[in-house]
A protein has these predicted regions:
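Compact, charge-rich alpha-helical regulatory domains located at protein termini
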Residues: 2-77
């Protein structure tokens, strides 16, 4: 059985993207286009959480959670 991939929304975008590189593609498709730039991921990504980014970008958190769930992730916190 495959290990469940878990995204903890209390962690920084940088931590999540480091653990699961495919998260960058999912988030980029949702409108977080800066995430694919290493400089942005290494600076803002270390301070930003997905819920904070969702508020800034005005993307419903439910949309983001649905996209992760469809990609096989479990979302917590």
């Amino acid at each position: 059985m495959m290990e469940k991939k878990t995204i903890d929304l209390s962690k920084s975008v940088f931590e999540i993207a480091s653990a699961y590189p495919e998260v960058k593609d999912i988030m980029s498709e949702l409108g977080f286009t800066e995430i694919v730039k290493p400089s942005m991921l290494n600076t803002m990504g270390k301070m930003m959480t997905i819920p904070k980014g969702a508020r800034v970008k005005e993307i419903p958190l439910s949309t983001i959670i649905d996209a992760f769930t469809l990609s096989g992730f479990e979302v917590i916190n």
